[in-house]
Amino acid sequence: MKKIAIVAKVHDPRCQGVAEELIQWLEERGLTPLVESHLARHLRCGEGLERADIPNLADLVVVLGGDGTLISVARLVGDRQVPILGVNLGSLGFLTEITLDELYPALESCLSGDYRLSERMMLRVELVRDGQAIKSHQVLNDMVINKGALARIIDLETAVNGNHLTTFKADGLIISTPTGSTGYSLAANGPIVHPDLDCLVITPICPHTLTNRPIVVSSDALITIRLQSQN
């Protein structure tokens, strides 16, 4: 590993300070720090590197912040096989497991090849209208359908692999990966799922029917959700 990208929560002064120290640490070891453009402007260290270019150039991405910052980076590099080292400087640290005290020892291990990759599954989501896919996204944590601010309960007809599962009458529906099970799904009374498991969690948001509970399905399942009505 020679080129190390640095992405941080730019408006957090603590993250900026750690980033400056990290840049110096890398340069002292003859490594090339690739500073994300927004962070570079805050640190006044040149133009930096656009996020879209990080997957093509970096051997490792160091993320300084919380889970939200790491998830935004995962969307970029998830299908490029670029490892991410998450350092917890935020309020949530389910994904950013490395503490600040562990940052440099962890980096030394990565540079020497003494590390273990934790692979996480991602979820591909398509929005279909009139039989045409109009949007497609790949996400690390979850996909959420919710009602508008002034709307009432919505009916969500749900099928798995073409077989009718149920119609959720609720404020919305969450489809989460094991990684996303500790986020919005957990707040909606969904289960915590170990990240090594190959499954997806279907969690209704404030269901109107008590029997509408979270359901766990296989990771290779095709989940189809049709909005029946919106009042």
Residues of each region from the PLM?
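ATP/NTP phosphate-donor binding region
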Residues: 1-60, 101-116, 127-137
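Redox-cofactor binding/interface segments in oxidoreductases and associated redox assembly factors
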Residues: 6, 63, 175
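Short glycine-rich anion-binding loops that position phosphate/pyrophosphate groups of nucleotides
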Residues: 11, 67-69, 92, 179-181
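Short glycine/serine/threonine-rich phosphate/pyrophosphate-binding segments
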Residues: 15, 68-74, 182-187
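Gly/Ser-rich helix-loop-strand patches that form or flank binding pockets
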Residues: 72, 77-87, 94
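Catalytic core of DAGKc-family lipid kinases
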Residues: 92-171
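ATP/nucleoside-binding phosphotransfer catalytic cores, i.e., glycine-rich phosphate-binding loops
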Residues: 145, 161-164, 210-231
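Gly/Ser/Thr-rich active-site loops/lids in small-molecule metabolic enzymes
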Residues: 166-211
